[in-house]
Structure formats: C-alpha cells, structure tokens
C-alpha cells in the first residue's frame, strides 16, 4: 500500500493524540455498549475480559522481543491489527463469535499505542514546535468521542462500530503518510540481540492475574481469588532477583497506576451493585474530563511549584480526593473522580518528564518503561480491591458482595458495606502515598 509521504499537521497530531489518550477506555466503552443487551453473562463479559487483559499483558511483555529501535514500525503494525479488529467488530453483527476475535486484535493492536506515540511525538515536535499545541486539541477530541459513544451506546444500528472503524482507518492513514522509518533511520522495530525473556514471563503473569481477577469480578466465584497471590509472589521474586535500582518516580508510577485503576473500577462496581446503572457512563465521562482539567491545572500549579514538590503535593491531593468516592452523594462521587484523576494525571505528566530524562534506558523505550510499571501498579491495586471486597463481604454479611453486580440484580442494602470497602482501600492508597513522599523521595538522584 503506497501513500504519498507528507509532513504532519496539527490536526493529524491531535487525532493521533486522542487515540493515545483513549486507547484503553474508548475500546472498553465500545465493546461494553455493544454487549449491554446480551442476555448471556458469559457472552457479555468474555470479549471485554479479553480486550482488557490482553492489552495490559502486551504492554508488559512486548519488551521481551528486544530493545525498541523503531517505535514507528510497532505503532504502524499495531494499527493494522486494530483495523482488522474493527472490521471484525462490524462483521460480528452477522456472526457474534467474531466479537471475541475482534477484542483480541484490538487489544493487541492498541496495547503499544501510547508508549510508541510519545517518542514519535517528541521527534515530530523537534522538527516543528508548533505541533505541540495539537496535544490539547487531542484531549478535546477524546472527550467528544466519549460523549458520542455514551449518547449512541443503546442504538441498534452499527453506528458506533462504523465510527470506530473510520477512526482507526483515518489514524492508520495518518501514520502511513508520516515518513517514520526515515526518522528512525530505517531501523528494525526491535534490537533482537537484546531480547529479555523475563518480560514474557511478566506478561504471562499479568495475563493470568487479570483474567482471574476480571473473571472473579464478572462471575463472583470467590475461589478464583486464591489463585492470584501466587502470580504476585513470583513477580516480586523475579524483581528481587533482578536487583533493579528504583527511583522515587518508579514508586510514583506504581502508585498512580493503582489509584487510576481504583477510581474507575471501584466506581463502576459500587454504582452498578447498588442500582445506579446510569452512573457507569458518567464515570467514563468524568475520567475524560479530568484529562483536559489536568492540563489546565498543571500549567497553573507549575508556575508556583516546581519539580518533586509538585508531584508530591499532587500525590497527596489525589489520595485525599479519592475519599469522595465513598460518600453517599452521586455529585460528590463525580467530583471526587474528576479531582482525584486530575491530580493523578499531573503526577503522570511529572513522571513522564523524569522518564524522558532517564539515561538508564534508550529514548525510544522510556515511555514504555513508565507504561509498563503503571500497568503493574494497576494489577496490584485490583488484587487489593477484590481481596478487600471478598474479605469484607465474608466478614460483614457472609455473602459475596459482587453477586448483585454479576447477576444484574442491584441491592441498595450493601451500599454501606461497599463504602466501607472503598474507605479501607482509600486509606491504603493514602498511606502508600505518604510513604512515597516521605521515604521514597530520598532516593532521588542517588
């Protein structure tokens, strides 16, 4: 396929940026909206389960192929896979099992999107600094797309799948027009001489953990919970064996992955379980709004607070605002999601700066390292959240708290005990945040 090479415009960059921001949440929303009317619980959950789990596992495992030389090629190949998945999504209206294959292709294809976009974006901005403004426009596009999907989620016509196909097709066209191979001197995607199979192990552990955790979330079979600690033990054992030198922003990355996961997952489980089903899409929308809000708030705060002080303050503020998710008010819950996510996003932005200057990694790989650790943090938080739900449920009412969520039979009577679960997890996040600020901060520049 030959496409005439052209320089990137601000609009092109904005569209690319919108996908780098929404590569996880947007497909998740789309698959959920397509399956919201399915009577069979297994048919409803399996594609969403595959999408999320395989995407997270690929982010962790991709480094096993070798050191990254050419992010452009990885991004391009991933978009072709996602495009194939988008086509199968439409064909699934004719043959439903294709939706599972679609989820697999979209998950694998979009997994490296953000980690590969960041170094490519940096190269583009070096050539034309005016392109930097396209990133803000990308956040606005991201928000508009979320609203579009939310409004049309119950439409019987395949409007959303067609939109997703056109969206991915246009982004693929944009990427093909960029002479990315020239930017990276026609290098191969990976330096195979620097393969590291341990990342394949981490990827498999992540996949198993997520499949088990999400299957527990969606089936309520409590015995599944006891299968996950083994994977976490193996993860820590391998980390100790590798003797990595952790920086303070390494711990910040784990933490921010955890709190962002908690904000979305706890909110969805709580509101669905107690009957606030309309809040599910509002949660997604609030998270999208926080993306724009964090950009504005960071610019204001960075004028007065610099460096580590900014990320430390935002860690504490995000940890405090997350308590609003546990209060008996939908308005305060949404405010909590927005504010906590805003400050968590600022931490992510500050962490990005640190990783982009981290000489331990080649420039093309620094964003992937950050994304990989953030993913690991989200997996750990899911384990903590679901174990807490399981233990509190058994100790409090001697029942599985996820049963109303799984069965689709809301039970407002468990609202109090679910809030107690949220409080416990929020306190743990706050304690970890304080430890990072007070203890891990001493490791900076050591």
PLM segments and residue spans:
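A late C-terminal transmembrane helix in Major Facilitator Superfamily
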Residues: 363-393
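Intracellular loop-helix junctions on the cytosolic face of multi-pass helical membrane proteins
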Residues: 127-138, 143, 149-263, 430-446
């Amino acid at each position: 396929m030959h496409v005439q090479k052209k320089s990137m415009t601000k609009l092109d960059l904005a569209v690319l940026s919108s996908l780098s921001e929404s590569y996880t949440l947007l497909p998740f929303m789309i698959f959920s909206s397509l399956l919201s009317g399915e009577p069979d619980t297994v048919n409803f959950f399996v594609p969403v389960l595959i999408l999320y789990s395989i995407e997270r596992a690929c982010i962790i495992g991709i480094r096993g192929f070798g050191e990254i030389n050419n992010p452009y090629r990885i991004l391009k190949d991933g978009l072709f896979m996602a495009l194939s998945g988008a086509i199968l999504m439409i064909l699934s209206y004719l043959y439903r099992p294709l939706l599972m294959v679609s989820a697999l292709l979209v998950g694998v294809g979009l997994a490296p999107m953000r980690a590969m976009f960041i170094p490519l974006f940096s190269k583009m901005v070096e050539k034309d600094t005016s392109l930097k403004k396209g990133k803000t426009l990308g956040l606005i596009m991201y928000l508009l797309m979320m609203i579009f999907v939310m409004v049309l989620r119950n439409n019987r016509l395949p409007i959303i799948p067609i939109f997703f196909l056109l969206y991915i097709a246009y982004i693929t066209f944009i990427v093909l027009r960029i002479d990315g191979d020239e930017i990276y001197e026609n290098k191969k995607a990976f330096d195979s001489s620097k393969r590291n199979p341990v990342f394949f192990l981490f990827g498999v552990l992540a996949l198993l953990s997520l499949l088990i955790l999400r299957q527990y979330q969606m089936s309520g079979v409590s015995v599944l919970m006891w299968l996950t600690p083994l994977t976490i033990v193996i993860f820590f054992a391998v980390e100790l064996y590798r003797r990595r030198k952790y920086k303070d922003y390494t711990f910040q990355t784990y933490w921010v992955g955890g709190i962002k996961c908690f904000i979305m997952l706890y909110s969805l489980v709580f509101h669905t379980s107690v009957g606030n089903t309309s809040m599910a899409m509002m949660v997604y929308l609030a998270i999208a709004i926080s993306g724009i809000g964090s950009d504005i708030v960071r610019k204001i705060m960075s004028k007065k607070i610099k460096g580590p002080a900014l990320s430390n303050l935002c860690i504490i503020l995000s940890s405090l605002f997350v308590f609003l998710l546990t209060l008996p008010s939908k308005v305060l819950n949404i405010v909590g999601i927005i504010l906590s996510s805003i400050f968590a996003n600022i931490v992510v932005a500050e962490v990005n700066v640190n990783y982009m200057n981290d000489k331990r990694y080649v420039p093309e790989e620094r964003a992937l390292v950050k994304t990989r650790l953030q993913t690991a943090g989200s997996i750990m938080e899911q384990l903590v959240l679901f174990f807490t739900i399981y233990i509190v449920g058994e100790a409090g009412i001697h029942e599985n708290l996820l049963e109303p969520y799984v069965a689709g039979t809301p039970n407002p009577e468990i609202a109090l005990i679910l809030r107690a679960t949220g409080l416990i997890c929020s306190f743990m996040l706050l304690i970890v945040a304080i430890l990072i600020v007070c203890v891990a901060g001493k490791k900076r520049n050591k």
